[in-house]
Amino acid sequence: GLQRDKMKLGILKEPEGEMRVPIVPNSIPKLVKAGLEVIVENGAGDLANHSDSEYESKGAKIVTRGDVLNCEALISINPPNLDDIREGCILMCVADPFRNPDVVNKSISRGITLISMDMIPRRLSRAQSMDVNSSQDNLSGYKAVLLGASHVPKGIPMMTTSAGTVKPAKFVVMGRG
């Protein structure tokens, strides 16, 4: 049969201040095994403590932003500047289309296939592994407790020591998710 070139999946570096990455190095081997060539923008994982060499050791290729933007498919947390994305590209990101209809409209006008990862249904069991909202909400809730705990003048857990017992702090959790 005919040998088909591997689809190139580009991982973009996020804007300043964003510490998450769309794909961690440990996920690269699965993508390569599925037949993708994974291309990572140099420094994409720096703020998440994932070095370029870590991505390379898992099978990704490290290149410049310009080279990543030439990939057939791109993945990022935040929508990149759509003027930089070529026509026909598949862009996967957290587009938040109801708050950012301009991202949807510009994608359509530029011929970009937009897959808004935050719009994948949460209730379908076969789609749960792709549910970015649950994982991010879980991490946000965990971090909220840690940040809140850093402002509490008492110990968080009850502790019984030879010097006595320290009563635990009390919390009120507002909201749900």
What is each model feature region?
Residues 5-8, 82-170:
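Glycine/serine-rich phosphate-binding loop and adjoining beta1-alpha1 elements at the start
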Residues 174-177:
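Glycine-rich Rossmann-fold phosphate-binding loop(s) that bind the pyrophosphate
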Residues 3-110:
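An N-terminal-biased, well-structured beta-alpha scaffold segment characteristic
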